[in-house]
Curated annotation (Swiss-Prot):
Residues 20-151 are annotated as: Disordered. GO terms for cellular component: chromosome, centromeric region; Ndc80 complex; nucleus. It is found in: Nucleus; Chromosome, Centromere, Kinetochore. One of its GO terms (biological process) is attachment of mitotic spindle microtubules to kinetochore. It comes from Emericella nidulans (strain FGSC A4 / ATCC 38163 / CBS 112.46 / NRRL 194 / M139). Keywords: Cell cycle, Cell division, Centromere, Chromosome, Coiled coil, Kinetochore, Mitosis, Nucleus. Belongs to the NDC80/HEC1 family. GO terms for molecular function: microtubule binding. InterPro entries: Kinetochore_Ndc80, Ndc80_CH, Ndc80_sf. The keyword Nucleus applies. This is Probable kinetochore protein ndc80. The keyword Nucleus applies. Gene3D superfamilies: 1.10.287.1490, Ncd80 complex, Ncd80 subunit. Its main location: nucleus.
């Protein structure tokens, strides 16, 4: 029978959460962190392959989850690749009918009952991690610790620090009925010089606060190291079995810090269970209400599902889930009522604003008519401006023309006066020579004829010379173009390693072009001689005095023959090298793109850290202002006391010693208040950061546990369906063999 892979499989044998891997991101308490760093000694990051595949129940919607994804290069001692979380049915420790259910969620993954007895974790927080690293990492998760034994930054050797954390631990044990539950009494000196029995009882009680279903069955030196490693205690490498067997003496500060860390972890889990971190998550934009509803559904449904027997049918098992599904739907509807009310208010505001817009549109004048009239006026204005500019240009043009004509008139009048004077002079000279009018006409006619003949000869000579110079200039231009082409060819040959013949691509061939032309001759001097109309450039254009160059003799290489074939072969070779270069370039570009993507991821990580730094600075400034205010108040109080002291000194000389003692006490109290304010500021600052880190990491842990179980259920269904198909295929084959 086919089933939806997104739902629980009711048909297969029941199994617990024991085979679900534990990728816990349980955070450190504030006392285990350095004051100067808010991200040091954190949990190992996940890899980038972790994504949500599908919901456990497709019929119920789930709100969008925040994705604080960052790149990482490793897990906590595991390979950085994808962790194998897909397991076969045989890997379940409770697959057989003989396996029992020792707890609500027994948590070890084994293939036989013997290994099950060794792995007896019962809480969802105590499953050992057997896979690789995961990828959905918040920027609040911890980074991998450095190689070697990490150094504890807490001043555990300080007597005052020991007294403080011991008092906090003692108060926590007293307020939570330690003596009643463990039937072991505590004294004021229990946490100063404890016995081995005191440590064992306190450790077991604190761990039961974290994992109530765990049972201690071995000696403490064998139980404590795996538990600390599983809880990811940052300094568990510095604790040996021999030290656990003798916790007193010099080793006690280390174990006192470890017990205080367990206490803070238990307190954090209690606060998270009571929802004290929900407001902080909401302020950061993370809605955990939906996660709480789904978690309550999963825990309740899984608990009821475990109550059924192995022989319970599918319908009865499905009926067990119906009340939980209905309750989850009701809780989601109740949570969505706030958003529905906000939507209704926004819809009402939207309708009111739309009504106002419509009213304003009705009362407003016709904008289309006004726009049309405005465009017409703009066109008229532009036309008048163009007309004014045109008329102004014509005025300037006519004024300049009038001035020019007046100058021409004055020049013409002066020339006319000079011509009249010349005519009068010529007439006087003719009268003195005694020439007649006929003689003058004949001489003028002869002069005109000779002048015309000279002009014709000169014009023909000029035309011939012009044609010669044009041809010469054309030939010179062609020669210069040819020289430029030869120079360009040789330059390209040098650039492409073809010239000289010893170049890389020449292969012993000569590719350098040269022109077989004469050089300019500067031996003939024309100084003092008859000027020649033939330029010296003509010497380079002629191979002989009256013969030019033959095209085949002008160049020293056969371009169309040998050179062209060699260049074609070289071009093919270069094309092949170019293709190989393009392929290599594409590979390098792909590598560059990958590097850019990695840089973008690192840049986003830096931005997240910068945002976190700014938040810490704002918190520091706020605490600084509070401390400053307190200090000012203390200063005012001190000044007031000093005035009273001076007054009392003036009036009562017999109480001088008493007032001096009071002043000393006041100063001591002021110093204590200052120290206490500084300590309180640091503690609050660290606690705020730790709370935010803890709740986000714990949320990621819960989410990942659900996702792993979802993937496990999907794999089991796929394997079950695959097994049914294989059985159907084997049956016909057996029949044929018979």
């Amino acid at each position: 029978m086919s089933q939806d892979t997104g739902l629980f499989s009711i048909k297969r044998p029941r199994e617990t959460l024991g085979s679900v891997q534990n990728f816990s991101s349980l955070p450190q308490p504030s006392s285990a962190l350095k004051r100067t760093s808010s991200i040091g000694y954190q949990n190992p990051p996940f890899t980038s392959q972790h994504t949500r595949s599908m919901s456990l129940l497709n019929s119920v919607g789930r709100p969008q989850q925040p994705n604080f994804q960052r790149s990482s290069s490793g897990g906590f001692g595991a390979d950085p690749g994808l962790s194998s979380v897909r397991r076969s049915v045989s890997s379940n420790v409770f697959h057989g009918t003989s396996a029992g259910r020792p707890s609500f969620a027994p948590g070890s993954m084994s293939s036989n009952p013997a290994s099950q007895s060794l792995q007896r974790r019962s809480s969802v927080f105590s499953r050992p991690s057997t896979g690789g690293a995961m990828g959905h990492q918040s920027f609040f998760t911890q980074v991998p610790s450095a190689a070697g034994v990490p150094r504890d930054p807490r001043p555990l050797r300080d007597r005052s620090f020991q007294a403080r954390i011991a008092q906090e631990l003692l108060e926590y044990l007293t307020h939570n009925n330690f003596e009643l539950e463990m039937k072991h009494s505590l004294g004021q000196n229990t946490l100063r010089s404890p016995t081995q029995k005191d440590f064992n009882y306190i450790f077991q009680w604190l761990y039961h606060r974290i994992d109530p279903g765990y049972r201690f069955q071995k000696a403490m030196d064998a139980e404590v190291p795996p538990i600390l490693k599983q809880l990811r205690y940052p300094y568990e490498k510095g604790i040996t079995k021999s030290q656990i067997a003798a916790v007193g003496g010099q080793n006690w500060p280390t174990f006192l810090g470890m017990l205080h860390w367990l206490m803070e972890l238990a307190q954090m889990m209690d606060r998270f269970a009571m929802g004290e971190y929900d407001e902080a998550c909401a302020e950061m934009g993370v809605d955990v209400s939906g996660d709480r509803i789904i978690f309550r559904f999963l825990t309740g449904a899984y608990h009821d599902w475990l109550q059924g027997g192995e022989e319970e049918d599918d319908d009865a098992a499905a009926q067990r889930l119906i009340p939980h599904i209905e309750l989850m739907a009701q809780e989601f509807e109740k949570g969505n009522e706030k958003y529905v009310q906000e939507m209704q208010v926004l819809d009402a505001e939207n309708r009111a604003l739309r009504d106002q817009i419509e009213e304003l549109e009705k009362n407003a004048p016709d904008m289309a008519k006004l726009d049309k009239q405005f465009r017409i006026l703009e066109d008229d204005k532009r036309k008048f401006e163009d007309y004014i500019q045109n008329v102004q240009g014509k005025i300037e043009k006519y004024e300049s023309r009038i001035a020019f004509l007046e100058d021409e008139i004055r020049k013409t009048e002066s020339e006319l006066q000079a011509a009249e004077e010349e005519r009068a002079g010529l007439q006087a000279s003719v009268d003195q020579q005694g020439l007649t009018i006929q003689d003058i006409d004949r001489m003028n006619t002869e002069r005109d004829r000779l002048q015309r003949s000279l002009d014709d000869a000169v014009s023909r000579l000029e035309e011939t010379h012009a044609r010669v110079m044009a041809k010469e200039s054309e030939a010179s231009a062609k020669l210069e173009d040819l020289e430029e082409l030869v120079k360009t060819y040789n330059t390209l040959g040098y650039q492409n390693s073809l010239i000289p013949s010893t170049a890389v691509n020449a292969n012993g061939q000569e590719y350098e072009l040269g022109l077989n032309v004469n050089e300019r001759s500067f031996s003939t001097s024309q100084i003092g001689g008859i000027p020649s109309r033939i330029s010296p450039e003509a010497d380079r254009l002629l191979a002989e005095p009256f013969t030019g160059y033959h095209p085949a003799h002008l160049l020293n290489l056969d371009l169309r023959g040998i050179v062209r074939s060699n260049l074609q072969a070289l071009r093919k070779e270069i094309n092949e090298r170019r293709k190989r270069g393009i392929d290599a370039d594409l590979e390098r570009r792909n590598l560059l793109d990958n590097i850019k993507e990695a840089m973008d991821e690192k840049r986003s990580e830096v931005e997240a850290l910068e945002h976190k730094r700014r938040t810490a600075e704002e918190e520091f400034e706020r605490l600084k202002e509070v401390t400053t205010t307190q200090k000012l108040a203390s200063d005012a109080q001190i000044e007031k006391m000093e005035k009273e002291l001076a007054k009392m000194r003036a009036t009562m000389s017999e109480s001088v010693q008493l007032m001096e003692q009071r002043e000393m006490n006041t100063n001591i109290e002021y110093e204590q208040l200052t120290l206490r304010a500084n300590a309180l500021r640091e503690e609050l600052h660290t606690n705020v950061e730790s709370m935010l880190n803890d709740v986000i990491r714990f949320k990621v842990h819960i989410q990942k546990g659900l996702e792993d179980y979802e993937n496990f259920v999907v794999d089991e269904v796929e394997q079950e369906l695959g097994g049914d198909t294989q059985l159907d295929e084997d049956a016909p084959m057996s029949t044929e063999e018979l």
